[in-house]
Swiss-Prot record:
Organism whose genome encodes this protein: Chlamydia pneumoniae
InterPro entries: DNA_Rcmb_RecR, Rcmb_RecR, Rcmb_RecR_Znf, TOPRIM_dom, TOPRIM_RecR
Domain Toprim span(s) in chain numbering: 82-177
Name of protein: Recombination protein RecR
GO MF annotation, one: DNA binding
Recorded family membership: Belongs to the RecR family.
Ranges that cross the membrane: none
Length: 200
């Protein structure tokens, strides 16, 4: 077993925690990073420090926001209140924004429901979601959730929780591959899934 200096071993260890990064890729990235000059590494280190100290979630929709701001720019700006899109994580919000297929409001669940792993949706996020529906009075709630077993369980749970609201609940159309996360879906496929969404 190759014995690396402690600082390099720790760097490889933490890089491997990133999704999709195995040992060889982590090793390659680590050697790339140690080839950077000290100033570049300090800038990168500051970026990591800022994530730890400044990361903050919007109290309304729970996507990411600037720590100095009261809420996120999605909630501050003029958007279509007739549509509310429910997603699992903040990254889904930014992905949908890049695809330019949605102009309404967002709500981030934080996780998908999974009885097997014990994942659940926080009561606070669910409570605020219901409160926002009462306030915004949207005509449609779009479940933009991965086409996985966890996504299906979450969609069914939300349908049951929100069924007393007089609002149409829809889910993205088939075309999103079963078992695939939004991360791997191109904008064109997502646009078709949005335009072909169906009542759920």
């Amino acid at each position: 077993m190759t014995r690396y200096p402690d600082y390099l071993s720790k760097l490889i260890f933490f890089l491997r925690k990133l999704p999709g990064i195995g040992f060889k890729t982590a090793e390659k990235l680590a050697f790339e990073l140690i080839s950077w000059d000290s100033e570049q590494l300090k800038i990168l280190g500051n970026a990591f420090h800022n994530v730890a100290s400044e990361r903050s979630h919007c109290p309304l929709c729970f996507t990411l926001k600037e720590s100095k701001e009261a809420d996120c720019h999605f909630c501050r700006e003029e958007r279509d209140n007739q549509s509310l899109c429910i997603v699992a994580s903040p990254k889904d919000v930014f992905f949908l924004e890049r695809s330019k297929v949605f102009k309404g409001r967002y709500h981030v669940l934080g996780s998908l429901l999974s009885p097997i792993t014990g994942k659940h949706i926080e009561n606070e996020r669910l409570s605020i979601l219901k409160s926002r529906i009462e306030t915004l009075c949207p005509k449609e709630i779009i479940l933009a959730i991965d086409a996985t077993l966890e996504g299906d369980a979450t969609a069914l749970f939300l349908k049951q929780e929100l069924q007393h609201f007089s609002v149409n609940i829809s889910r993205l159309a088939l075309g999103l591959p079963i078992g695939l996360s939004f991360d791997y879906v191109d904008s064109g496929t997502l646009a078709r899934a949005f335009s072909g969404r169906h009542s759920y």
